[in-house]
Amino acid sequence: MIRGKIDILVVDDDVSHCTILQALLRGWGYNVALAYSGHDALAQVREKVFDLVLCDVRMAEMDGIATLKEIKALNPAIPILIMTAFSSVETAVEALKAGALDYLIKPLDFDRLQETLEKALAHTRETGAELPSASAAQFGMIGSSPAMQHLLNEIAMVAPSDATVLIHGDSGTGKELVARALHACSARSDRPLVTLNCAALNESLLESELFGHEKGAFTGADKRREGRFVEADGGTLFLDEIGDISPLMQVRLLRAIQEREVQRVGSNQTISVDVRLIAATHRDLAEEVSAGRFRQDLYYRLNVVAIEMPSLRQRREDIPLLADHFLRRFAERNRKVVKGFTPQAMDLLIHYDWPGNIRELENAIERAVVLLTGEYISERELPLAIAATPIKTEYSGEIQPLVDVEKEVILAALEKTGGNKTEAARQLGITRKTLLAKLSR
């Protein structure tokens, strides 16, 4: 793994203490960032890579234990050292139980501090817990669920290699985020990452985008253009929705991968390229091969390493963290003070099935923040499809008829729309006639 200097985040609401630590740590060769509150620390961890966090326990608003837990939720691998006054050693023990790697007594013994820092960083390298040169949170990959931890482990293992990767998952699960993390954590990270959505272009435009074209090769080609393969030379090429390309483009892409060279449209000259290829699709390419719609040889070339993206409903325990992440982002963007979600609103978010996955959650939170007039997001600000979600309770042994469940959802939708049957039907994705028929059963 290629690394630069070690980045340390110091979290303490004592500005003078922060300044002293910053000067000391910089003298030891570390890069140092300062956060004067827990909320500031979380904002920085979301945006930047840190190899270690040094956090005080006693802080106003959000104390060190709460900050520790939130940082661990964003990035379970990051080592955190807690600073505490001698009189609060019990709190330090609590911090260790919550995931702190070690604690330091204030006023700090600088020799002990240096020794503890070196041990913490060495421990992280030895255990392999260190995220590579970019943290998951930096790419919006937030969560502590088993499914998310499995995905992050796969990225950490696969990123250093040059193997072609095929990412499969439903729309909105974050396939491009994984591609960006794989590139950023690779030895090619200082070279370009070039992306292309194959489904957005017809065959002729896709060929020109991938391989480039000569001046005059077709109508409108008023100058020569390099393709995405050449632009990505030395770096990574990410092809999204690879399952949507035509049979002819499959042949040309296969040749480029096999020969490691491309040919501009309208040219006989070949150009050697060195790229790592990452492809993504929502389609089952094995099924597409069986159906004769996708070349088997290209499938094998792409499917060297397969990464399966979990849907949001497979990692419901991550929804509160993701919702909070989006809430903070959109509250800041809209210059609003939003303190959080009501318990009822969070229950709805957790129980909704999210067919659009993380992208749908992000859009729902943005809408809620824009519509919000108070301090807490409630079910009133959520889209109707989410607000009408039945909250699943502990199974009582009695099966409720499907017709009753449907009626409950429709009644909730009608309440939400003030009795407007047409609007309720529209937001539920059914016709008004179907809604009336289900109500009359």
From Swiss-Prot:
GO BP annotations listed: phosphorelay signal transduction system; positive regulation of DNA-templated transcription
PROSITE patterns documented for this protein: RESPONSE_REGULATORY, SIGMA54_INTERACT_1, SIGMA54_INTERACT_2, SIGMA54_INTERACT_3, SIGMA54_INTERACT_4
Activity control note: Activity of the ZraS/ZraR two-component system is repressed by the zinc-bound form of ZraP, which probably interacts with the periplasmic region of ZraS.
Domain Sigma-54 factor interaction, residue spans: 141-370
Any Pfam family: HTH_8
UniProt-listed SMART domains: AAA, REC
DNA-binding region range list: 421-440
Protein modification: Phosphorylated by ZraS.
GO molecular function terms attached to this record: ATP binding; ATP hydrolysis activity; cis-regulatory region sequence-specific DNA binding; DNA-binding transcription activator activity
InterPro entries assigned: AAA+_ATPase (IPR003593), CheY-like_superfamily (IPR011006), Homeodomain-like_sf (IPR009057), HTH_Fis (IPR002197), P-loop_NTPase (IPR027417), Sig_transdc_resp-reg_receiver (IPR001789), Sigma_54_int (IPR002078), Sigma_54_int_dom_ATP-bd_1 (IPR025662)
First and last residue of the signal peptide: none
Ranges where the Response regulatory domain occurs: 7-121
Localization of this protein: Cytoplasm
Residues given in the record as ATP binding sites: G172, T173, R329, R359
Keyword Repeat: no
Swiss-Prot/TrEMBL keywords: Activator, ATP-binding, Cytoplasm, DNA-binding, Nucleotide-binding, Phosphoprotein, Stress response, Transcription, Transcription regulation, Two-component regulatory system
A GO cellular component annotation in the UniProt record: protein-DNA complex
Residues recorded with modification 4-aspartylphosphate: D56
Role played: Part of the Zra signaling pathway, an envelope stress response (ESR) system composed of the periplasmic accessory protein ZraP, the histidine kinase ZraS and the transcriptional regulator ZraR. The ZraPSR system contributes to antibiotic resistance and is important for membrane integrity in the presence of membrane-targeting biocides. ZraR is a member of the two-component regulatory system ZraS/ZraR. When activated by ZraS, acts in conjunction with sigma-54 to regulate the expression of zraP in the presence of high Zn(2+) or Pb(2+) concentrations.
Oligomer and partners: Forms homohexamers in the crystal structure. However, the dimerization interface between DNA-binding domains observed in the crystal structure suggests that dodecamers, rather than hexamers, might be the functionally important oligomer.
PANTHER family: PTS-DEPENDENT DIHYDROXYACETONE KINASE OPERON REGULATORY PROTEIN-RELATED, TRANSCRIPTIONAL REGULATORY PROTEIN
Protein name: Transcriptional regulatory protein ZraR
Native source organism of the sequence: Salmonella typhimurium (strain LT2 / SGSC1412 / ATCC 700720)
Lineage of source species: Bacteria, Pseudomonadati, Pseudomonadota, Gammaproteobacteria, Enterobacterales
